[in-house]
Structures are given as structure tokens and as C-alpha cells.
Curated annotation (Swiss-Prot):
The keyword Cytoplasm does not apply. This is Probable G-protein coupled receptor 162. Residues 39-49, 113-133, 196-275, 325-588 are cytoplasmic. It comes from Mus musculus. Disulfide bonds: none annotated.
């Protein structure tokens, strides 16, 4: 772009300056709208959504800084013949343009790689913290792009004829051979990686997965034919990754794993990523690579190369929003985008993870699964956590609940919430308990014992009375009978004493060797009482509880061991719901 006269090449550049400026403003608004639309439609930002937002942000910077700078300088030169590029503006333009060009190439390649990873290895993708890896990839992309693109500004250029000496000759052949070769190789690597990942994704989606599904159905059908008595094996669906939400004892979301996408959503996202990759390769990657190759070969930079590079860069910033808008998953209306803008401007600090911190109303946040690990039919969206009133945190319902990555001492435990403070009505107690759960009941007069001195004086007599009552057949009772007689008083009157001590229940919960209190083994024959203290065999209210510092007078009157099989539906009685509450909060 040598200065002097209004030659044909100068006239062509200046005639396009106003168009570049208008298209840059339109691209800036369109990409900003796309970022707000994705944020409004997807409350939980996944790796693909994050990469799409970063790609749109890169296009905003491309339209706002280098392209707008080039257009403004050309308009200024058209208005004043004395104005021209200076060294500082040219260096800023070259550094920002090549930084954003490389960042766009690598972000598109990373987008296609994450989609291939999610389709080809779905379980590994969900267990590998892909969101953090996407953030690290973006930081690495920007670091590499910025370092390489700023090297020409600090001396890595052709010293014979510097690219900013006459105008601003930003084609790679005018900057330097070393920079041109490195830039072309990095650009070629990003293009090839994106195309390979898209090809693997399409193969996995269109051929490999349906073929494996057909093979699984044929294998299941043959097994079902051989073992027809088992039933249902021939029609077993293909494996799907369950949606898992990990919560602490207060229901606070700690981490989550997304489940398998529906066929419609998977196809939409795959088509969108593939379209973005082909858009970039056809409009930006390959044209810039061809221009760089021919410019290095001929050691020249004619005006058509400048026009081709700038218009290709502008075209991709305009077409990306239209591609994302065509995907129904990320299409938001004006009202939704406006609400998202208001939420961002108001800087609302409320929790947006679908959980609640205040559990004084007795609600429990949880995600339920069936026995095969699939999500229940009640809620397919893992971000929408259901608040179920009237549920107690000590005992899960019939359907299996997956509490993952929560320490045993924190699982259904007492650390962060006081679940023993609120008294409940007699009708809110458990209506039915498993017949395999045996509860020993001592006489009513034994519950009125005093402190440890009285208990030590009558311990042997109480043990003899226990054995006599058990021999007579009156030592076993249901949990409901135990609670009504021991906590509520006989005849449903006012309570005469506490049901269990807090230390008793928490010790039972924390010291159980199984994944949860609900998964204890089946009943076993009664064994002689061991002489030594074993915390894993400590029953609620046993005399041995003195080793953990429990009051002995009241704990001696209640001895309880809760057992039951996890696989038995009778272990939890009839189904629980808001109209059929379960074990309430116990009082002290």
C-alpha cells in the first residue's frame, strides 16, 4: 500500500472502507446478541456453550479493533491526503489482527474437538471436567496467539524493508519469512484438526452408534429368546449416561454430571459445530492460508490479497451469528435477552444453582435415579432440582438416591443443619417399618431411670428383665409401636421423653460401614453381647454408648438396631409423598 496518488489499488481499498465500517458495527451487535442469547437459554454453561461465547467474543474484537481501525484509517486518508499510517497504529493493527485470527482458528478446532470427545467417549467426557479443560484451552490459545503475534512488533520482522515503513503492509510476506512460516503452519494445523474431529463426529453419529445399537438389540434379542423367563432383555434400550447431581447435606449443589442428550439435541449441536467448522475453513482458514502461501512464494502483496483477507475475516464475523441463531437450542426472543441484560446489570448475587440454603421448612433437594442408574421420569433436566416438602433427611425414599463424592460422615448427617429441633405431630411418624427390623423395648418404668449412678446400680437387673421379656415374646415391636409408646406416650398422649439422643443417631449414621444407613445388611441371628466396644456394631441406646459420652439413664431404656435389605421394596413401607409423611424431626 504505497503512498502517492489515487491509483487503482488505493481507490479499491478506500471504496470498501465505509462498507467495512458498517459491516463491523453490524457484526459487533450480532455477536453480542448471540452471547446474551446463549447465556439466557442455557442457565448452566457447558463447555460447548463457553467455547461458542468465546468464539463470538473473538469476532466482536475482530470487528471492533483491527477491521474498524483499518476502515477508519482508510476513510481518514480519503478525507485528508496528508494523513497516513504511523508505526504505532500499524503495529497495533498487525498484532491484534493476527492474534484474533489465530485465536479464532484454535477456538474452532477446540470446539470441534470437544464435540468429537462428547460423542465418541460420552462417559469419559463427563468424568474429566471438560468445562475446566475448555477454560484452560482458551487461556492457552490466547497466550500462544498473543505471544506469536506480538513478536513482529518487537523486532521479529524483515529489517531490510520494515512492514510499517510505507503504509501498513500486513501480509505475512512483508512482515518476515519466519513469522509467515510459523503463522501458516499453525493455521494449517488448526484447520486439519477441526476437519478431522468433525469427520469422526459424523462417523460416530451417523454410522458407528446406530450399528452398535443394532448389534446390541440383536444380542439382547438372542439372550431374551434363550432366557425368555427373565423377560424384557430383548427390548432393553441402549446405554445412556445418567444425569447426576452431587449435593451436600444442606442440598447445596457441589458438582454435577450431564446426562445423555436427546437424539434431536445431539443432531442439532453436531450440525451446528460442523457448520461453524466448514464456515471458518471455507471463508477464513483456507483463503488466508492460500494468500499466505502465494505471498511467501512470490514475495509480494498485491491489493487483491489485502481485499481477500479483510473481506473473509469480515464475512465470518457476520455469518457466525446466523448459524447459531438457526439452532433452536440457542435461539432466544427479545424478552429473554432483555431479562438476561437486566440480571447482568443488576448484579444479582443470589444462588443460581437451583438449590436452597434454608431448610427450616423441612424441604430436601435431591435427584432421584432408578436401579439402573437412569434418571427418573419426573425431571429430565438436571439443572431443575425438585423441592419435595415433608421429606426427612434421615431416610431416603423408595427410589434410589445417588449421593456421590460425599464423605461418609457427611452423608445424610447432622453437620450443617439441626434436624432435631422442631417437634412434629404424632400423625407424622412413620406408618410402617420392615418386619425384619427388631426393636427392643424395656418396661415403662425402666425409662424413668435417673443419671449414671442409678443406672450402674440396676444394670444387671435390667439386663435380666430384658432377657425374660424377650423370651416371653414381647421384646419385638414395630418402629411405630416403639415411637408411640416411648416418645409419644401410651395412647397417643403427650410425649414422656425423647425418642433417641442426637449422639445416638449421629453415631449410628457416621459409624455405619455401608454407603448409607439405608443399605444395611439383612437381619442376622442374635449373637451374644461382645465384651469389647465396637463402634460399627453400636446399637442406638445400648449400654455400651457410655464410651461415646452418652447419658446412661435414658439411653439404657431404648435399644434399637435398624436392619433391612436395600433391594426389598418392603423395607421402606408404602410409597412416601406429601400426603404420607415419613419419619419426622426428633426432639430432645
Amino acid at each position: 500500500m504505497a503512498r502517492g496518488g489515487l491509483g487503482a489499488e488505493e481507490a479499491s481499498l478506500r471504496s470498501n472502507a465505509l462498507s467495512w465500517l458498517a459491516c463491523g458495527l453490524l457484526a459487533l451487535l450480532a455477536n453480542a446478541w448471540i452471547i446474551l442469547s446463549i447465556s439466557a437459554k442455557q442457565q448452566k454453561h457447558k463447555p460447548l456453550e463457553l467455547l461458542l461465547c468465546f468464539l463470538a467474543g473473538t469476532h466482536i474484537l475482530m470487528a471492533a479493533v483491527p477491521l474498524t481501525t483499518f476502515a477508519v484509517v482508510q476513510l481518514r486518508r480519503q478525507a485528508s491526503s496528508d494523513y497516513d499510517w504511523n508505526e504505532s497504529i500499524c503495529k497495533v493493527f498487525v498484532s491484534t489482527y493476527y492474534t484474533l485470527a489465530l485465536a479464532t482458528c484454535f477456538t474452532v478446532a477446540s470446539l470441534s474437538y470437544h464435540r468429537m470427545w462428547m460423542v465418541r467417549w460420552p462417559v469419559n467426557y463427563r468424568l474429566s471436567n471438560a468445562k475446566k479443560q475448555a477454560l484452560h484451552a482458551v487461556m492457552g490459545i490466547w497466550m500462544v496467539s498473543f505471544i506469536l503475534s506480538t513478536l513482529p512488533s518487537i523486532g521479529w520482522h524483515n529489517n531490510g524493508e520494515r512492514y510499517y515503513a510505507r503504509g501498513c503492509q500486513f501480509i505475512v510476506s512483508k512482515i518476515g519469512l519466519g513469522f509467515g512460516v510459523c503463522f501458516s503452519l499453525l493455521l494449517l494445523g488448526g484447520i486439519v484438526m477441526g476437519l478431522v474431529c468433525v469427520a469422526i463426529t459424523f462417523y460416530q453419529t451417523l454410522w458407528a452408534r446406530p450399528r452398535r445399537a443394532r448389534q446390541a438389540r440383536r444380542a439382547g434379542g438372542s439372550v431374551g429368546t434363550k432366557a425368555g423367563g427373565l423377560g424384557g432383555l430383548g427390548t432393553r434400550p441402549a446405554f445412556e449416561v445418567p444425569a447426576i447431581v452431587v449435593e451436600d447435606t444442606r442440598g447445596k449443589r457441589r458438582s454435577s454430571l450431564d446426562g445423555s442428550e436427546s437424539a434431536k439435541t445431539s443432531l442439532q449441536v453436531t450440525n451446528l459445530v460442523s457448520a461453524i467448522v466448514f464456515l471458518y475453513d471455507s471463508l477464513t482458514g483456507v483463503p488466508i492460508l492460500v494468500v499466505s502461501f502465494f505471498s511467501l512464494k512470490s514475495d509480494s502483496a498485491p491489493p487483491w490479497m489485502v481485499l481477500a483477507v479483510l473481506w473473509c475475516s469480515m464475512a465470518q464475523t457476520l455469518l457466525l451469528p446466523s448459524f447459531i441463531w438457526s439452532c433452536e437450542r440457542y435461539r432466544a426472543d427479545v424478552r429473554t435477552v432483555w431479562e438476561q441484560c437486566v440480571a447482568i446489570m443488576s448484579e444479582d448475587d443470589g444462588d443460581d444453582d437451583g438449590t436452597c440454603d434454608d431448610y427450616t421448612d423441612g424441604r430436601v433437594c435431591k435427584i432421584r435415579f432408578d436401579a439402573n442408574g437412569a434418571t427418573g421420569s419426573g425431571s429430565r433436566d438436571p439443572t431443575q432440582v425438585k423441592l419435595l416438602p415433608g421429606r426427612h433427611m434421615l431416610f431416603p425414599p423408595l427410589e434410589r438416591v445417588h449421593y456421590l463424592q460425599v464423605p461418609l460422615s457427611r452423608r445424610l448427617s447432622h453437620d450443617e443443619t439441626n434436624i432435631f429441633s422442631t417437634p412434629r405431630a404424632p400423625g407424622s411418624f412413620l406408618h410402617k417399618w420392615s418386619s425384619s427390623d427388631d426393636i427392643r423395648i424395656l418396661p415403662a418404668q425402666s425409662r424413668a431411670l435417673g443419671g449414671p449412678p442409678e443406672y450402674l446400680g440396676q444394670r444387671h437387673r435390667l439386663e435380666d428383665e430384658e432377657d425374660e421379656e424377650e423370651a416371653e415374646g414381647g421384646g419385638l415391636a414395630s418402629l411405630r409401636q416403639f415411637l408411640e409408646s416411648g416418645v409419644l406416650g401410651s395412647g397417643g398422649g403427650p410425649p414422656r421423653g425423647p425418642g433417641f439422643f442426637r449422639e445416638e443417631i449421629t453415631t449410628f449414621i457416621d459409624e455405619t460401614p455401608l454407603p448409607s444407613p439405608t443399605a444395611s445388611p439383612g437381619p442376622s441371628p442374635r449373637r451374644p453381647r461382645p465384651l469389647g466396644f465396637s463402634p460399627r456394631r453400636l446399637s442406638l441406646g445400648s449400654p455400651d454408648s457410655r464410651a461415646v459420652g452418652l447419658p446412661l439413664g435414658l439411653s439404657a431404656g431404648r435399644r434399637c438396631s435398624l436392619t433391612g435389605s436395600e433391594g426389598s421394596s418392603r423395607a421402606w413401607g408404602r410409597p412416601w409423598g406429601p400426603g404420607n409423611p415419613i419419619f419426622p424431626q426428633l426432639t430432645l
